[in-house]
């Protein structure tokens, strides 16, 4: 499957995800946290391989630091997941309600983000941060 086909599939799934109740989205965030902890050693081993390859290719120290995913970064992302679960549902909030004219009202309501594309380099923690924010919202 290429990127265009994957994008089409995502667009088809987006309305289903957008309709998920907050309880289900929060359970998904909790499950991500659980799975990260359950697979921590596999994740760390994969990261060690990435770091080794980066070192062989003389990657800059600043990039090496960003590429590192260790116990501290795992603790950070799992704490972020917990914090995100505790936030109120961002969907369906009225942020503006204005009578423009007789019979004409302007209302701004928050809605799900939808399908996004992200390019990031050397930040394994970014995957969890970005995907969890999208899931919550």
Regions found by a protein language model. Give the residues of each.
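Substrate-binding/gating loop at the entrance of the active-site cleft, primarily
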Residues: 97-113, 117-137
């Amino acid at each position: 499957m290429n990127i265009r086909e994957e994008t089409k599939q995502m667009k088809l799934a987006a309305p289903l995800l957008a309709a998920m109740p907050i309880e289900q989205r929060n359970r998904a965030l909790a499950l991500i946290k659980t799975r990260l902890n359950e697979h921590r050693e596999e994740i760390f081993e994969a990261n060690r391989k990435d770091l080794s390859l980066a070192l062989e290719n003389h990657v800059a120290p600043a990039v090496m630091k960003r590429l590192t995913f260790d116990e501290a970064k795992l603790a950070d992302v799992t704490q972020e997941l917990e914090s995100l679960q505790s936030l109120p549902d961002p969907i369906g909030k009225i942020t503006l309600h204005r009578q423009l004219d007789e019979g004409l009202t302007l209302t701004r309501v928050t809605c799900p983000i939808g399908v996004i594309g992200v390019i990031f380099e050397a930040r394994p923690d970014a995957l969890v941060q970005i995907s969890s924010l999208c899931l919550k919202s």
